[in-house]
From Swiss-Prot:
Disulfide bonds: none
Domain of life of the source: Eukaryota
Protein name: Probable E3 ubiquitin-protein ligase ARI15
Function according to Swiss-Prot or TrEMBL: Might act as an E3 ubiquitin-protein ligase, or as part of E3 complex, which accepts ubiquitin from specific E2 ubiquitin-conjugating enzymes and then transfers it to substrates.
Residues the entry annotates as binding Zn(2+) 6: 236, 239, 246, 252
Keyword Zinc: yes
Length: 452
């Protein structure tokens, strides 16, 4: 037992009989504890502090420097910090730190928290990533889901993913969420910010009917009726006929084709911009839901109402559920872009589910608003609606995780593996291709347009 206490830094105080007790010095800077020391008496002053397990005394300034060095300068954190004396292993505990300054006490508390987190890392302790939140969340994880996020609701109201620490991004995976925020979303925003480029191409070029490469109209010679492509093909930019079949009079034998030949299908093959619009609208709804929750919390704190504690709990849970639902609907837009961009049947079904879910959330929000303004709160009604909306979104999440199984995608097996069929052109694409190879190929799309 004595050996264990010694190794733990809990050995009893043993005063050296040869120690000169006529003067008390700081063991580091050698300053005397009392500035008024006259050399005639033993000085025992509060400025000199030791651990309960040894007699080595040090001034507050030296204690502060020593603890700061151990708190922030060591590579590996240890819960037990020993006495500053090199030959002493007495542990520095709260009994010693509470005699120091408030700043030192705060450093010690952070150090102990860090030590606890490192020691019990298997318990998965993490700080809430919300700005200004100091809550630490302890999550006992039995089995970790490798594919989908684990949503955590902090006491501050922030909802985040336990795996990647991003905001809760159900129903997409952590990798999908990271790609959406860092790559896909920026790409869609760039496409929206550059409408002039597409307009200029539509107004100043015509697709060659031979190779379908855009050919610029000669602005300096607008009377020039025939254009020459890099493939050596010549055609009329009004009716797309060759000089041989155009006619000798110079007039077009057929009405002019649309200037959007070859580009309409390309634009239709990029439906992600509509996902961006839905994403932005969902973000606005999410911000409003968070604002209503914060306003409710502030009103309860500043002006306590006549509502019972149970009523406040029901309203708070309802408002937090709305925030979670709005956040899920927001990230379902990313799911829309990632998983249904080229499967219009699934996209239409997903949009139907999103619209239905949004209507349910809006109706629930109105019910909470009406109950809040009413003189008497009907808890039974709100609890019933909370259960119903929770069940609806549970099945909604399950449906998206399973890949919208209600919509059967046509496919067939070939020697190269399974293929998916494009809804527009029925071309068989490999599952490794997110976009239809035929629709997104400029040559193929222009051939399809000319054949109409």
């Amino acid at each position: 037992m004595e050996k264990l206490m010694t190794e733990s830094g809990l050995k009893p105080v043993v005063i050296d009989s040869n120690q000169d007790l006529s003067r008390v010095y700081c063991g580091i800077c050698s300053n005397i504890g009392d500035d008024d020391y006259d050399g005639d008496a033993v000085v025992v002053d509060g400025d000199l502090i030791s651990t309960p397990f040894c007699s080595h005394k040090f001034c507050k300034a030296c204690w502060s420097k020593y603890l700061k060095k151990n708190f922030f300068s060591v590579e590996k954190n240890h819960t037990a910090i020993s006495c500053p004396d090199r030959d002493c292993r007495a542990a520095v505990g709260p009994e010693t730190v509470e005699k120091l300054t408030v700043r030192d006490q705060a450093m010690y508390e952070l150090y102990i928290l860090k030590s606890y987190r490192e020691k019990y890392l298997g318990w998965k302790l993490k700080l809430c990533p919300a700005r200004g939140c100091n809550y630490v969340i302890e999550f006992h994880l039995a089995s970790e889901d490798e594919e989908h996020s684990l949503n955590i609701v902090c006491l501050c109201g922030h909802i985040f993913c336990w795996r990647c620490m991003l905001e809760s991004h159900r129903p997409v995976t952590c990798n999908n969420a990271s790609d959406w925020l860092s790559r896909d979303l920026e790409k869609l925003i760039e496409e929206v910010d550059k409408p002039s480029t597409v307009s200029w191409i539509d107004a100043n070029t015509k697709p060659c009917p031979h190779c379908f490469i855009p050919v610029e109209i000669d602005g300096e010679r607008p009377w020039a009726q025939f254009l020459t492509c890099v493939c050596s093909g010549r055609f009329c930019w009004k009716c797309f006929r060759s000089p041989e079949t155009h006619g000798t009079s110079g007039s077009c034998l057929a009405p002019a084709r649309s200037s959007n030949v070859g580009f309409n299908h390309w634009n239709r093959a990029k439906p992600g911009i509509s996902c961006l619009d839905l994403w932005n609208a969902s973000q606005v709804n999410l911000v409003n839901a968070k604002y209503e929750l914060e306003a409710f919390e502030e009103s309860i704190i500043k002006k306590p109402s006549d509502l019972k504690e149970q009523d406040v709990k029901v309203l708070r849970e309802g408002l937090m559920l709305i925030v979670q639902c709005r956040q899920f609907l927001k990230w379902s837009c990313a799911y829309d872009y990632i998983h249904t961009e080229y499967d219009m049947a699934k996209r239409e079904y997903l949009r139907f589910l999103q619209q239905n879910a949004s209507g349910i959330v809006h109706s629930f929000s109105q019910s909470i608003k009406e109950e809040t303004e009413a003189k008497e709160l009907t808890c039974g009604k709100l609890l019933s609606e909370t259960t119903n909306i929770g069940n609806f979104f549970y099945h909604f999440i399950k449906t998206l995780r399973e890949g919208l199984p209600e919509v059967q995608a046509e496919s067939y097996d070939n020697y190269g593996g399974p293929y998916w069929l494009c809804d527009r052109c029925t071309y068989g694409n490999s599952w490794f291709q997110r976009a239809c190879k035929m629709c997104c190929d400029p040559t193929a799309s222009k051939m399809d347009e000319l054949s109409d």
